[in-house]
Swiss-Prot record:
The keyword Nucleotide-binding applies. Plants silencing ACLA-1 show a severe dwarf and dark-green phenotype with some seedling lethal plants, reduced leaf cell size, altered cellular ultrastructure, altered plastid ultrastructure, hyperaccumulation of starch, increased accumulation of anthocyanins, chlorophylls and carotenoids in vegetative organs and decreased accumulation of epicuticular and cuticular waxes. These phenotypes can be complemented by exogenous supply of malonate. One of its GO terms (biological process) is lipid metabolic process. This is ATP-citrate synthase alpha chain protein 1. Heterooctamer of 4 alpha and 4 beta chains. Keywords: Acyltransferase, ATP-binding, Cytoplasm, Lipid biosynthesis, Lipid metabolism, Nucleotide-binding, Transferase. Its main location: cytoplasm. Citrate binds at N343, T345, R376. Disulfide bonds: none annotated. ATP citrate-lyase is the primary enzyme responsible for the synthesis of cytosolic acetyl-CoA, used for the elongation of fatty acids and biosynthesis of isoprenoids, flavonoids and malonated derivatives. May supply substrate to the cytosolic acetyl-CoA carboxylase, which generates the malonyl-CoA used for the synthesis of a multitude of compounds, including very long chain fatty acids and flavonoids. Required for normal growth and development and elongation of C18 fatty acids to C20 to C24 fatty acids in seeds. Belongs to the succinate/malate CoA ligase beta subunit family. It comes from Arabidopsis thaliana (Mouse-ear cress).
Length: 423
């Protein structure tokens, strides 16, 4: 499971659309999204309610405590909303120690209300927890002792008996309505593969639940079965995290292929760089470097898997090598080309792309004093490793090559020994 945060606009869009599908009832949620590409005149034409009602506007940037930070404006007309957005769009703010520009806003009707309730559903390995409180809103943390929580093991149904502790203290006139709302939201949570869904607060409008503020996370590994349900979903980067051009390039490659190609720069001046086959293996290699005390020297996180084509590996390897060899400073560096034992990926075929990239970047590798460490196993691995050994002689770059007889992460220790001995 990969938990990915989505914008409030998308959370509300999914809840509104699928609440009706699953319950037959309409949630009167209305909201629009504004970013730098939005034509405000076209937006008002498409959503006439924007010009006839009082509005709420706030950043939609995956961070909380917007109200406490003075980033929520209430009871505005649309002209005031436009001014609010213009004054803040692209401006940098700091939230919980993270700095970044505000790029996206959500606008919705202002809903006068007295009651504020809290609802949260979150999944973990063993099941789902559902939390509810009659004291929701911006002071929820101060009133956490009033939050009630139940746990449902995986596969269990949310029956009235199980739900009863959550709504036990509600007035009778609203108890059934809120209980039914919680049950539908839980069904929707599972149906859409949410991993986290929080409404803080939701209120009652004409006796029916109405979510005012919402946060959501989806299991993005379930995208293959939910692409129609999710629609045009966006998984934004965490607030304060901006992709570099090289990361954006790899992200574009990843979106176009059935394989997996991941790349994140951790420290541009790092002296240990990785290019690892397999999602699990890539994390193990990175953790091993950290466990050995050299996390500060780890330049990147990189993972390729799912039998990428040779040309895809070539483009991917070019980017990794360019970053690993940038700005040579006379200090030695290490490139770890690792992986476990593949099940179906042709090791020699994927190595072909890496070898082509290494040949192209021969001069850069030498200028950066790069030492390469290789460890791999799987189909056709002997041929792939033989090509790697021959490559070292061809381009005059030191390459240490190991097969499955060596421990998977042993080359991490060798890489560290190399950069420290040559320092």
């Amino acid at each position: 499971m990969a938990r990915k945060k989505i914008r409030e606009y998308d959370s509300k869009r999914l809840v509104k659309e699928h609440f009706k599908r699953l319950s037959g009832k309409e949630l009167p949620i209305r909201s629009v999204q504004i970013n730098e590409t939005t034509d405000l005149n076209e937006l008002v034409e498409k959503e006439p309610w924007l010009s006839s009602e009082k509005l709420v506007v706030k950043p939609d940037m995956l961070f909380g405590k917007r109200g406490k930070s003075g980033l929520v404006a209430l009871k505005l007309d649309f002209a005031d909303v436009a001014t609010f957005v213009k004054e803040r769009l692209g401006k940098e703010v700091e939230m919980s120690g993270c700095k970044g520009p505000i790029t996206t806003f959500i606008v919705e009707p202002f809903v006068p209300h007295n009651e504020e309730y809290y609802l949260n559903v979150v999944s973990d390995r063993l099941g789902c927890s559902i939390s509810f409180s009659e004291c929701g809103g911006i002071e929820i943390e101060e009133n956490w002792d009033k939050v009630k929580t139940i746990f449902l093991p995986t596969g269990a149904s949310l029956t009235p008996e199980i739900c009863a502790p959550l709504v036990a203290t509600l007035p009778l006139e609203i108890k059934a309505e809120i209980e039914e709302f919680i049950k539908v939201i839980f069904t929707l949570f599972q149906d859409l593969d949410f991993t986290f869904l929080e409404m803080n607060p939701f209120t009652l409008v004409d006796g029916s639940p109405y979510p005012l503020d919402m946060r959501g996370e989806l299991d993005d590994t379930a995208a293959f079965k939910n692409f129609k349900k999710w629609g045009d979903i966006e998984f934004p980067l965490p607030f304060g995290r901006v992709m570099s051009p090289t990361e954006s390039f790899i992200h574009g490659l990843d979106e176009k292929t059935s394989a997996s190609l991941k790349f994140t720069v951790l420290n541009p001046k790092g002296r240990i760089w990785t290019m690892v086959a397999g999602g699990g293996a890539s994390v193990i290699y990175a953790d091993t470097v950290g466990d050995l005390g050299y996390a500060s020297e780890l330049g990147n996180y990189a993972e390729y898997s799912g039998a990428p084509k040779e040309d895809e590996v070539l483009q991917y390897a070019r980017v990794v090598i360019d970053c690993a060899t940038a700005n040579p400073d006379g200090k030695s560096r290490a490139l770890v080309i690792g992986g476990g034992i593949a099940n179906f990926t042709d090791v020699a075929a994927t190595f072909n792309g890496i070898i082509r990239a290494l040949k192209e970047k021969e001069a850069k590798l030498k200028a950066a004093r790069m030492h390469i460490f290789v460890r791999r196993g799987g189909p056709n691995y002997q041929k792939g490793l033989a090509k790697m050994r021959a490559l070292g002689d061809d381009i005059g770059v030191p390459i240490e090559v190991y097969g499955p007889e060596a421990t998977m992460t042993g080359i991490c220790k060798e890489a560290i020994q190399y950069i420290t001995a040559a320092a």
